[in-house]
Regions:
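Metabolite-binding pocket within alpha/beta catalytic cores that recognizes anionic/polar moieties
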Residues: 1-142
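Flexible, glycine/charged-enriched surface loops at secondary-structure junctions
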Residues: 45-50, 152-159, 245-254
Length: 254
């Protein structure tokens, strides 16, 4: 049975969205609560659908039609979100997430814009073999960098690691990644990049750093105001990047 083929152009099983419900441009936070924060930046924001961990809002930012859909935590649910959004017309995706840095030069409140992700997860291996790279769309990466620079936000461009097991990352494991020059960790981006590539979509990620696992700064400090600031900056940069891409501002256009 071709589940994907059967759901093209239909109301989607998990996200409960159908044709016409979503825009070409989509922001993908993990947290449903972050969808509400994104909606605060949108004109005419309205709730489109909610089912399980998937909350979807739609509105406009600087004239650009934008959808925000939460993916939940991890690659399996992120893959479902991307597939189902693409089935009903979404084409450009920017993940707006949080991240734990392992590069000691990356501070809480900074942004990380990945140019690649190590596939330390299981979902992408159902799509492509070992050794296949997980890389974002260059035009979107450039638009994110330009947006961060325009706002004067401190950002880092580099490789991240997408991991499955939040509590199983040992000090030795993190040190090995740090020696490779890995900037930070997340739990969704590598699968986002792989699925987008296979489906002919555009995808990138911007991450707000909420802790540094090497220095210990911010680890589990849930009330740290820098966490909220990091998320706000990531949202702003992602929205501005979409506006730049829509205008064709040197990033390929939509």
């Amino acid at each position: 049975m071709d589940k994907r083929g059967m759901s093209l152009g239909a109301r989607q099983y998990h996200l409960a969205v159908g044709p016409g419900d979503v825009s070409e441009c989509v922001l993908l936070p993990g947290d449903p609560g972050r969808v509400l924060k994104i909606a605060e930046f949108l004109e005419g924001a309205r709730k489109v659908a909610e089912n399980r961990e998937f909350l979807t809002y739609r509105g406009t930012y600087r004239g650009v039609d934008v959808t925000a859909t939460s993916t939940g935590i991890g690659c399996p649910s992120a893959a479902i979100a991307i597939e189902e959004l693409a089935n009903v017309g979404a084409r450009v995706f920017i993940r707006v997430g949080t991240s734990g840095a392992i590069d000691p030069e990356v501070s809480v409140g900074d942004l990380v814009i990945p140019v690649g992700a190590i596939r330390n997860e299981g979902t992408s291996y159902y799509y492509v073999p070992e050794g296949f790279p997980a890389v974002p769309d260059f035009g979107l990466v450039r638009a994110l960098v330009e947006a961060a620079e325009e706002r004067g936000y401190r950002y880092h461009v580099g490789v991240i690691s997408t991991d499955d097991a939040f509590y199983a990352e040992t000090p030795d494991y993190l040190e090995d990644l740090r020696k490779l020059g890995v900037k930070s960790l997340d739990m969704e981006s590598s699968t986002l990049f792989v699925v987008a590539h296979l489906r002919g979509l555009r995808a990138a990620t911007v991450l707000g750093v909420v802790a540094n696992l090497t220095t210990g700064d911010g680890v589990f400090a849930v009330e740290d105001p820098r966490r909220a600031e990091a998320v706000r900056r990531a949202i702003e940069v992602a929205l501005e990047a979409l506006a730049r891409v829509k205008e064709g501002g040197g990033a390929g256009g939509i």
